[in-house]
């Protein structure tokens, strides 16, 4: 009841007084309402907390291609890439004749006409054929894999021109193993600068993303 009486008799005017600036790091704001005093300090106003720093998490991408052909040649190729780093290609192909065999990434993942419909080597930069370590090469030039006496070729290839994402991603394209050795563009044959004179296409498989 005392509070109600006080408010009902209080004048309608409100007087605010501000102290002179002082070195006090917590200045106060005084408000007088007919005998009532309210003090505000900077500490009484909650401040927004600073955002937490962002953490960068490595992104791993993986893909696989299952190679099949009209002969007994078959195999599995897995590809993996960390962030924007090089792509690691793990190859295991069986049924080959012993020796070197050209191994390339081709432009299309179209196998409606077998390996012949996979197109030419993947070549987004318009280069001539070369070795994987050459500056001038097709992006799809992965060199040779070597089959042992049992016809099994196992290899690990690390390459920077066959990413699993981005405008030149290899997803949906095809890996092809060839009949002959790739001359890496240095054989002097009329096909050296286009196919490496690697002969027929023994088996192929479309590159597709796989769960990590």
UniProtKB/Swiss-Prot annotation:
Residues where Zn(2+) binds: 121, 129, 138, 141
CDD domains on file: Cu-Zn_Superoxide_Dismutase (cd00305)
Cofactor(s) this protein requires: Cu cation; Zn(2+)
Highest taxon above the source species: Eukaryota
Keyword annotations: Antioxidant, Chloroplast, Copper, Disulfide bond, Metal-binding, Oxidoreductase, Plastid, Transit peptide, Zinc
Cysteine disulfide links: 115-204
Gene Ontology MF: a single term: copper ion binding
Family, similarity comment: Belongs to the Cu-Zn superoxide dismutase family.
Described purpose of this protein according to its UniProt entry: Destroys radicals which are normally produced within the cells and which are toxic to biological systems.
Protein name from the UniProt record: Superoxide dismutase [Cu-Zn], chloroplastic
Organism: Vitis vinifera
Name of the gene: SODCP
